[in-house]
Amino acid sequence: MKGKIIKGIAGFYYVKVEENLIECKARGKFRHKDVKPMVGDNVVIQVENGKGVIESIEKRSSELLRPAVANISLAFVVFAIKSPDINFDLLNKFLVLCEYNHIEAIVCLNKVDLVSEEERENVKKRINDIGYEVLYINAKEGLGTDILKEKINGNITVLCGPSGAGKSTLINKLTNKEHMLTGIVSEKIGRGKHTTRHSELIEVSNGYIVDTPGFSTLEIKELMNKEDLKYCFPEFEEHNESCKYRGCLHNKEPKCTVKQAVEEGKINKYRYEFYIKTLEEIIEGEKNKW
């Protein structure tokens, strides 16, 4: 029978088959092939005496490594607009990770009541201009949860963002229950105490939400090579193949159409600067491998 892994704890996988939840172990053949089932996997299982065994894993449409989550189709990138102030380099990092994993990203700005409408709109425009949808939310009060539930419909949705941004509180509001302990943000350091224990799919509005502890520790330089990075910036897309030199990295090469677009104001210069900084980190990391 077919089902979906919604939780994994200490080698046990909990597979939802229609309305039933079946505790399963994976066949030894997966370990021998260095394949590990992931939360979000669509699987075929056999059941005996109420216990299941995972026989096969269907092809994944996407996968994240930390935490191990498969078949994500949508990401809510949750950032507090204030307390702490939004870190655009960190936001760009999450957006690049979403693009690399072929996951649609929607930026959710939390704590919008702490800033003026003008400041809020300026931040929204800055993000809209690079091609991403922005939604205003107040995780504590539940503001914006209705439209988020509409977006979740039919998707497996991952919440990502820095510690203290309101992810756990938002999950509690979306699921109408205290799914996770919510850490208290330290006023001194402005970071949340991460209290999540494991990854899990939570059913919401004919879709699923995934809690993703540890996602913020991912380093781009660990995931991709220097040739991959430019394809993670949607605003580069129309220019990537029109540079003079094939394989142009949009850095020091002459007659680069991306650099020209930056000079003409068609590409945000701060995003481009983030691209160059990240590119240099990847190149340095590649040197250190050898």
Curated annotation (Swiss-Prot):
Binds 1 zinc ion per subunit. GTP binds at residues 110-113, 161-169. GO terms for molecular function: GTP binding; GTPase activity; metal ion binding; rRNA binding. It is found in: Cytoplasm. GO terms for biological process: ribosomal small subunit biogenesis. Residues 61-218 form the CP-type G domain. Keywords: Cytoplasm, GTP-binding, Hydrolase, Metal-binding, Nucleotide-binding, Ribosome biogenesis, RNA-binding, rRNA-binding, Zinc. Zn(2+) binds at residues 243, 248, 250, 256. It is an enzyme of class 3 (hydrolase). It comes from the Bacteria. Its EC number is 3.6.1.-. Monomer. Associates with 30S ribosomal subunit, binds 16S rRNA. One of several proteins that assist in the late maturation steps of the functional core of the 30S ribosomal subunit. Helps release RbfA from mature subunits. May play a role in the assembly of ribosomal proteins into the subunit. Circularly permuted GTPase that catalyzes slow GTP hydrolysis, GTPase activity is stimulated by the 30S ribosomal subunit. This is Small ribosomal subunit biogenesis GTPase RsgA. The lineage of its organism: Bacteria, Bacillati, Bacillota, Clostridia, Eubacteriales. The gene is rsgA.
